[in-house]
């Protein structure tokens, strides 16, 4: 890890070395084409390499880089997300990559139920990629109060905001996100600088939420 938790080139390579020293089956990259070293190690060790994308242009770049799986992630996704809905993005990516026979396509973004999985495959995806739903499982180490929040929050109670990382991410609406939406609020900093502002405060909020603190 670099200063304040950000990754430099050398520390990133060290983390890749650690990851590939274990018997992993798959490794996934986001926010750009995977580093060449990641692609080389994946091929050498027969590890499936995936990439998250939010546009057809990104999907084409990733396919040309040599990844095995494209995860087509719509704006409904929790955490970092793009601007295009899953329903629109998945068939666009499927069409754009029709000549890349070696690449499998997974749909992501707001997918939880079997019906949603079936719908994704009806649009041409080979399967789905799910994330937030696993935070609510018995095996997850998510704090009980956070699990309850995730389960009871309605689909109309999330917002797409830059207030945490500087890039748009989907979060549960909260006083924190409300404050950043005020006319008097400053513009969030670009990634990764916004995390220097947000993480100390959100870290404390998370610890208090874990013990069901209310004020």
Regions found by a protein language model. Give the residues of each.
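Active-site entrance/lid segments in N-terminal catalytic domains of soluble metabolic enzymes
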Residues: 1-101
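Intrinsically disordered, low-complexity regions enriched in small/polar residues
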Residues: 8, 214-215
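Conserved active-site-proximal phosphate/metal-binding subdomains
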Residues: 83-106, 112-213
